[in-house]
Amino acid sequence: MKNINNKVLALVVAVLLAFTGALNAQTAAKSKNTAAASKQNSADVIPLDPAVRTGKLPNGFTYYIRKNIEPKNRVQLYLANKIGSIMENDNQRGLAHFMEHMGFNGTKNFPKNDLVNYLQKAGVRFGADLNAYTSFDETVYQLPIPSDDPEVLKNGIQIMRDWAQDATLDVAEIDKERGVVLEEKRLGKGAQQRMQDQYLPMLFNNSRYSDRLPIGTEEVLKNFSAETIKQFYQDWYRPDLQALIVVGDIDVDAMEQTIKAKFSDLKNPAKPRQRTQYSISLLNKNQFMAVTDKEFPVSVAQVMIKHPETKL
């Protein structure tokens, strides 16, 4: 789309908030159609690939293993935590993302920078290969490593185990990382964020999602105590909210036994906090918004459609 004057952005966000089950049925025929559509949706749930070995340990920790011989002698490890910024208290805004950073700043078996240094020596590039992300509802760590080196594979699983519940959260390392995260927040400021600040309240219908962006607030990032982030880690990094995904050129049986041996001792809190399911209410109508910013170099049109959650 051509940009008028090459300076002014016209960002069109059309939010089409309509799906089966959200409409108010006004006739018996509509109700029948809605029920039929819901039944069809249930039949369309994506089945689990039969090649995936899955299981759940007594502590609630879930695992998924799939053998994939290409690329040869490589394996991808993912630690998925069912926790993101949506569950942060007001004094924790930004700490789900900050906690993700701290996983690389010292664990029980890899203190300080040893984790990154070890993996780089094994040929794993920090950022390009070794990485993680935090969203509203999840935090996921990824680690691609060689699978033909038993020592590297063993340590890769140990790193996943350390991330799950053995990050050290050293006070000095926390304070060092504040500057990194604050700089990340600063770099995110600009035309895109200014426009986002305008349309997200409409997109999220002023729900909790509107004020729980993963980057957090500057006030919290500058001032939170070590105890505050440790409490967040203890509350939410727990086996009943975690899963390990292993895909690659590996022995599935051996990997399953390794996972059982390594992750069965993870502990859930004596009084686990409830993970509240937040949602975005539908308005049963189409919405339109146009926002502009002179620093945004292109024109963009977006059509967004809200669908029911897909159960896997």
Task: Explain the meaning of each model-derived region.
Residues 39-80:
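Mature N-terminal segment immediately following signal peptide/propeptide cleavage
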Residues 71, 81-194, 223-241, 251-254, ...:
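Active-site-adjacent, His/Asp/Glu-enriched structural segments that form or flank metal-binding
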Residues 10-21:
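Bacterial N-terminal signal peptides
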Residues 58, 72-74, 123, 134-138, ...:
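Short, solvent-exposed loop/turn segments at the edges of secondary structure
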Residues 1-12:
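Bacterial N-terminal signal peptides that target proteins for export
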Residues 52-54, 62-68, 230-235, 285-293:
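Short, surface-exposed beta-strand/loop micro-motifs that present aromatic residues
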Residues 35-53, 141-144, 201-242, 274-279, ...:
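Histidine-acidic residue clusters that define the catalytic metal-binding segment
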Residues 28-38, 206, 243-311:
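An aromatic/glycine/proline-enriched structural segment found at the starts
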